[in-house]
Amino acid sequence: MPDHTPDADPAEARLALLRLVACGGPAAPRRRLLEHIPDPRAAIADAAACRDCGLSSAQLGALRGPAPDTLRHARDWLQAPRHHLIGWHDPDYPPLLRRSPAPPLALFVAGDPALLWHPAVAVVGSRAPTPGGRDNAAAFARALVGSGLAVASGLAAGIDTAAHAATLAAGGHTVAVLGTGPDIAYPRGNRELHARIATAGALVSEHLPGTGPRKEHFPSRNRILAGIALGTLVIEAAERSGALITARLAAESGREVFALPGSIHNPLARGCHRLIRDGAALVENAQQVTEALAPVAEALAGALRRRLAAPIAGDGEHGAPARVAPERAAQAQRLGATRDDADYQRLWNALGFDPTGMDELVQRSRLTTAQVSSMLLLMELEGRVAAHHGRYTRSR
């Protein structure tokens, strides 16, 4: 069997990963390739493995051809301090995002990549909120920070901006998921906030540096936002809103969805009311959010502690792997709580050492799909369950 031990030259490995990102097309075959060969240089050089993993002829042609000019800008961007590239094969890839549907092949991060492991709530809503909606976004963000959670949002105008700004003002941790490259501030009015988050938080994008705003990128931005968070809180939203897309994606990932009720006369309350009718939790204060998320947050804190103990290469700068900070795990521990052991035992009994799909686990355990998905996430973070392409086994 060929030796695919990762090469010692991180710059060449990063270039190979950049080429894999830039070749475009469906991400799933490229993820399979990195699962099969976790060294990007060896992966893209193995034509047979590329074909076996499902890469298209167009993708193969892009990998074999000359490196596009866009990669030069990306390589230059990665040379700056606190600029990182985290691939699917990387142990620093965010564990919650890994468990979401259709995760991205790689993430560009400006700022602190350890924040992608920190328990977070996505706070989303209208780009043109009411004054009350803006105030609620800021108040909930401050309270979530006080409970030890990070606040994630999309750096859009309105609710996103209010949540990010209030988090920074409270001395908390915030993650901004972008629909552009990590170096592009959009909207332009948020250039200062973009710079502040790069310094005190984390900017995250699946797009190459230099990529400008494109309409088709923002739904995928919402997918990542829903995927890195323990749950999604919708402050204000019209019936047709990007915030509702984020909420739907969160539910599909087995995450909690929360919504604030509002006046029946406020058009921006209708989206929240629709979510509540569809099963989202109605919340009136941040404590209700933290109580609902406490079990999974504690499991994520355990994953943080294990990651702290793991050996790493590099110092976290210039694209090298980054160790999560000890205070992240300490803050996450504040969210610990007990869980319903009877339901977990039912799911554990339904699991075996042969890979089992979600539908069969729901049938065996007689729990709901949402319950099983959430419990599997927690058990996987604890190291009790292993996931194999949508099927699950006991790991011990």
Label each region the model flagged.
Residues M1-A102:
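N-terminal positively charged helical leader segments and presequences
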Residues P2-E12, D76-R396:
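Glycine-biased, small-residue-rich flexible motifs in mid-sequence functional cores and linkers
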